[in-house]
Amino acid sequence: MPVPAPLTGVVPPVCTPLTPDREVDVPSLLRLVDHLVDGGVNGLFVLGSSSEAAYLTDRHRRLVVESVVGHVSGQLPVLAGAIDMTTPRVLDHVRYVTEAGADAVVATAPFYTRTHPAEVARHYRLIAAHSPVPVFAYDLPVAVHSKLGTELVLELAAEGVLAGLKDSSGDEGGFRAVVTGARAHPGISGFSVLTGSELVVDSALAMGADGAVPGLANVDPHGYVRLYRLCREGDWERARAEQERLCSLFGMVRVGDAGRMGGSSSALGAFKAALHLRGIIACPATAEPQVPLSPEEIEGVGKFLAGAGLL
């Protein structure tokens, strides 16, 4: 379905369930999609960080998009990551995901190669010129090692190059500058500013953000939808209480032993363990070479679920 302008609400970055031999587990993926739709989300973002897009082969990426788009059948917009190191590779992904039915594409700045802001701007202009669907920028400096500047984002928004921004930078001052700048700019309309944080959704919405793309919404979509609704209703006391409950639940991402695994292994392993414990996916496997959680660490995830009333 066409992406609303602006896109608002809760748009989970959908986890990619895998089989024990690391193929895409399509039945589990579709159960997860049903879980999210039943939770009342406003859109789905596949092939992002929580989707383990960086680990998926091109064949797997296309299968994910085709499966999700076919299953939702236009009920919700499906945004698909077209994330790769350089512009030519991203343009290939744009073609593949849009042929598979994606309603919008999401792209980071180029990475691995050393780039200049002028080249980042050219990157997005080329993507928009070749994409038949709207383009969202994904600000993820922890992974791509460059920050999308406020002036650049607003310039590209005013040109119509970008339909929105998913901000996972952790820079709340910069996020506020984009929110207020987009609102004040006479040449910008329908531009969506989305926080990628699980922990400050209430404050992001209070400052004027359009919605959120929280990975934890895979586990508890109802909670984030409830939080969004409370914020929109101006019930800030109950919204704060719901945000605090979700912050406590988010503690699961730290169950993994930092001495033997990276942060992504711990966080994504926790999300998948939670989905497995809740009976939504068949296997909690993460993509190689991520280190799996131990039985004791998975038990710890279960305690977080129980504490949040989800198990």
State the predicted function of each range.
Residues 56-59, 117-120, 148-150, 177-178, ...:
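Short secondary-structure transition/capping segments
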Residues 39, 63, 67-72, 96, ...:
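Alpha-helical structural signal in soluble globular domains
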Residues 11-15, 39, 209, 220-311:
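C-terminal alpha-helical cap/extension of soluble enzyme domains
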Residues 26-33, 150, 295-305:
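Short, amphipathic alpha-helical "lid/cap" segments that border enzyme active or binding sites
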Residues 2-147, 290-291, 311:
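Active-site beta->alpha loop and helix N-cap motifs at the rims of alpha/beta catalytic domains
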Residues 29, 61, 65, 90, ...:
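A general structural signal for well-ordered alpha-helical segments in protein cores
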